[in-house]
Amino acid sequence: YISVNSKPEDLSASKTVARKFINKFLQKNKDFQVEEIDLYKEHIPRLEYQYFEKRNCIVNEDDAKKLNDKDQKEVQRIRALCDQFISANVYVISAPMWSLSFPAPLKEYIDCIMQDQKTIKFEGKKIEPLLNDKPRTMVYIQSSGGNVPWMLRPILNKGLNYVEDIIKFMGIKKFEELLVDDTGFTEEEKQEAINKAYEKIDDIIDSMKF
């Protein structure tokens, strides 16, 4: 579970819906364990040129030893984030819509997990996905203050579209969106949006295959 919101859970519509989703998912899939990462609390490295030996490929362990201590720790952290992502079967991201996109920490996280020979591979001039090795599902839970008409979503919902594209680019074929739209300005409006999102949870969970 990847949360991308600095608000406490009880103040965040996206995190509130995500928690409900996770709890219901675990009720129906008792063999699963949840790992949680809060991108506002965890350290997500900002990628520097010296961390790479080639495009989208982190330096190998021998070359990493030539870096200073700080850079070595950053490379180790990038590897750990990528390996953690690869190990999962189901991914849940909760994020608000900000400026037609999402908060910046999510992009920094995605940059860390887009790694050659890990989540993608280069075959000549072609890029091949590597996360199509088993059934995987991404559930993207997004809150927004207004209600974006479905006809305008390709234009206005750029963050959601980007996440879906990049996830499928890595080979995760099943992408589900759970939108908490029209949270408005009052607590009543927010709760109504949350309740509407709750109604969609069971159908999404029941559609998953492992």
Map each language-model feature to its residues.
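N-terminal beta1-alpha1-beta2 submodule of the flavodoxin-like/Rossmannoid cofactor-binding fold
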Residues: 1-95, 100-108, 199-210
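Cofactor-binding loop segments of dinucleotide-utilizing enzymes, especially the Rossmann-like FAD-
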Residues: 4-6, 143, 180
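Short histidine/acidic/glycine/proline-rich micro-motifs that form metal-
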Residues: 6-10, 147, 184-185
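A short, structured loop/turn motif at beta-sheet edges
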Residues: 26-29, 132-135, 168-170
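Residues at the starts of beta-strands that form the adenosine-phosphate
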Residues: 31-33, 136-137, 174
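Short, solvent-exposed coil/turn elements at secondary-structure transition points
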Residues: 40-42, 144, 181-183
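Helix-loop-strand module that forms the ligand-binding subsite of alpha/beta enzymes
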Residues: 70-161
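Glycine-rich phosphate/pyrophosphate-binding loop and the adjoining helix
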Residues: 150-210
